[in-house]
């Protein structure tokens, strides 16, 4: 047996991991929880859009955070280092405000 036959292709294994589905927990301000199954390479814009449709609110009315950092539409679970059962927190977007004098 040659060395080429004995070694698995690491390139192929890397692709398999990237295409793997993970389950993410999305928790709203009211403590409601929805589970989503997504691929590691899928932009999280799809998850955000789906969550907002289920809640009946516009996407731009909510902000999504992972480990305290805002999630951009083009972020993927792979880029953010997400793992199985990780939590995404959802908050109402707050704009403006002013001080009282």
Curated annotation (Swiss-Prot):
A GO cellular component entry from the record: nucleus
Residue numbers covered by the propeptide annotation in the UniProt entry: 98-101
Superkingdom classification of source: Eukaryota
Subcellular localization(s) per the UniProt record: Nucleus
Pfam families named in the record: Rad60-SLD (PF11976)
Major site of localization recorded for this protein: nucleus
Key words, A-Z: Isopeptide bond, Nucleus, Ubl conjugation, Ubl conjugation pathway
Stored InterPro entries: Rad60/SUMO-like_dom, SUMO1_Ubl, Ubiquitin-like_dom, Ubiquitin-like_domsf
Tissue specificity field: High expression levels in testes and peripheral blood leukocyte. Expressed also in lung, placenta, liver, spleen and thymus.
Residues covered by the Ubiquitin-like domain: 20-97
Protein family (similarity comment): Belongs to the ubiquitin family. SUMO subfamily.
Protein name: Small ubiquitin-related modifier 5
Organism of this sequence: Homo sapiens (Human)
Gene designation: SUMO1P1
């Amino acid at each position: 047996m040659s060395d080429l036959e004995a070694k698995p292709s690491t390139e192929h294994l890397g692709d398999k991991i990237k295409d793997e589905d993970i389950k993410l927990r999305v928790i709203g301000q009211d403590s409601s929880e929805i589970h989503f199954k997504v691929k590691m390479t899928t932009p999280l814009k799809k998850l955000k859009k789906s969550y907002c449709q289920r809640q009946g609110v516009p996407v731009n009315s909510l902000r999504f955070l992972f480990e305290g950092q805002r999630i951009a539409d083009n972020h993927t679970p792979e880029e953010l280092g997400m793992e199985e059962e990780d939590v995404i927190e959802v908050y109402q977007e707050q704009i403006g405000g002013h001080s009282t004098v």
